Amino acid sequence: SEFTPVTSDLTEKMFKEFFDSSEAAVFTGGPDVAAAFSSLPFDHLLFTGSTQTGKLVMKSASENLVPVTLELGGKSPVIVDENADLKNTATKVMRGKTMNAGQICLAPDYVMVPKGKSEEFVKESETAVKSMYENLKYNQNYTSVINEKHYDRLNNLIEDAKEKGADIR
């Protein structure tokens, strides 16, 4: 990602160390590099990123009939069974949600719990987060949202939820 140059550089370094250039390669850059790269006649192309960019990659790759594997942003629901251990489940869900500030494709976006168990699940989730991170906002060991655009998007979602009556804690 053009938003994480240090991670991209480390990934490139590791690939060069462990793979022959004929097996795998890492290319870094922004949308211009991605557009040029995805129009080349590769045997296969793997893209991880946003749905919007994934559509552009797929379109460019289709010009050369290049098979494409896309790992795109999803909603990652969690369905909690009626017999689930809510404390254990909440801990696992919150660990997944808080990893990298929720900025990974598998971070759960919503949880469906059986009727009558939502309040208990919320309390267990709050306890789980507090046990992992005493303080999220001022924690030097917890990452932040990647950029202002994404920060604003999240704040808009929170405001929309509040306007619709959500209990934001």
Model regions: which residues?
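Short beta->alpha connector loops at strand-helix junctions that form conserved
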Residues: 1, 28, 48-49, 81-82
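CheY-like receiver
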Residues: 9, 36-37, 92
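Active-site phosphate/pyrophosphate- and oxyanion-stabilizing loops and adjacent acidic/basic residues
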Residues: 13, 35, 55-59
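Conserved donor sugar-nucleotide recognition element shared by glycan-biosynthetic enzymes
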Residues: 4, 30, 34, 50, ...
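Conserved small-residue-rich beta-alpha loop and adjacent elements
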Residues: 1-22, 65, 87
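ALDH superfamily catalytic-core signature
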Residues: 19, 44, 52-169
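Generic structural signal for helix capping and beta-alpha/helix-loop junctions
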Residues: 5-6, 34, 54, 78
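A structured beta-alpha segment of the ubiquitous adenosine-cofactor-binding alpha/beta core
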Residues: 25-43
